[in-house]
């Protein structure tokens, strides 16, 4: 061992931020194990790596006793005082026991420790970088596929895209560039493990934040997202700025903003509606593109009964109940849809308005992607 090791550790500390002292302490600990494994397993030893020269020495540590029972661990008071007259019973004497051929073992051990610590440090850097990217999107390149995952390169690391996080309307092949949403970053013994998604509602949210400057700067707030990936989604938006149309901001000039997101999601339809703190208005908006005649609210059950024109019933419910299902997810309210005819037969429509009540509904403002 020589000063070359110390020079190498100094470079590592500067370039990779790995503490030189921590590596030296790790080397010393590893050399203790190496000494015991190769020379004397039972002996209590200390290894000293000289911080200036790089030389390594091994010291046996022995307790000073009146009567010796184990020469590997103990030394008599007489022998100890022969080394130094001030030693007393209970003290610890260190005697150098560095083997002649220990240099080869030390060099090999040091190399292994440094390699391991560098690998751990690099994994730590990657983990720190990606843990801050949770709930964010990145562009990756498909590397390979199997029956469980698509393996996506994110540059420094390969992420896993599970089957249940893949969009049903997409097919993937190596070298495809795709945007993915980072759902989880885990520490494992083999390094950071990153899981990504193409179906998570957060992907849609982040795409709007990227495409719509008013959302990015906070002028428009994206309040909620409901998504059935690859088929249809709904988002609700609001603003405190009376001069800004939140729905129009998301649609963009000639529909360019929302169309860019639809293209990224391979044709997924997107409804954009105005959010409201009033559940009557919000639920009516959320059922877009259907026209709504009335919304009856049950606050205790957090449930609503929605009356729509007979000819709009199928549109309000949607194919396989999708429109109603997405509206319920978007608003957080249960939604039971009834036709005008059924509502009249049940006696729940029309309701009598109080003197101060305004007309129940005008057409809700909404936007739907063209795809």
From Swiss-Prot:
Protein name: Transcription termination/antitermination protein NusA
Region Disordered, residue ranges: 347-371
InterPro entries: KH_dom, KH_dom-like_a/b, KH_dom_NusA-like, KH_sf_prok-type, NA-bd_OB-fold, NusA_bac, NusA_N_sf, S1_domain
Native species: Bacillus subtilis (strain 168)
Keywords assigned: Cytoplasm, RNA-binding, Transcription, Transcription antitermination, Transcription regulation, Transcription termination
Residue span(s) of domain S1 motif: 135-199
Cited SMART domains: KH, S1
Pfam name, any one: S1
One function term, GO molecular function aspect: RNA binding
Family label: Belongs to the NusA family.
PANTHER family referenced in this protein's UniProt entry, alphabetically: TRANSCRIPTION TERMINATION FACTOR NUSA (PTHR22648), TRANSCRIPTION TERMINATION_ANTITERMINATION PROTEIN NUSA (PTHR22648:SF0)
Chief place of localization: cytoplasm
One record GO biological process: transcription antitermination
Segments forming domain KH: 301-367
Gene Ontology cellular-component annotations: cytosol
Stretches of the chain forming a coiled coil according to its record: none
HAMAP family for this protein: NusA_B
Highest rank taxon of the organism: Bacteria
Organismal lineage: Bacteria, Bacillati, Bacillota, Bacilli, Bacillales
Function: Participates in both transcription termination and antitermination.
Assembly and binders: Monomer. Binds directly to the core enzyme of the DNA-dependent RNA polymerase and to nascent RNA.
Location(s) in or outside the cell: Cytoplasm
Compositionally biased residues, Acidic residues: 353-371
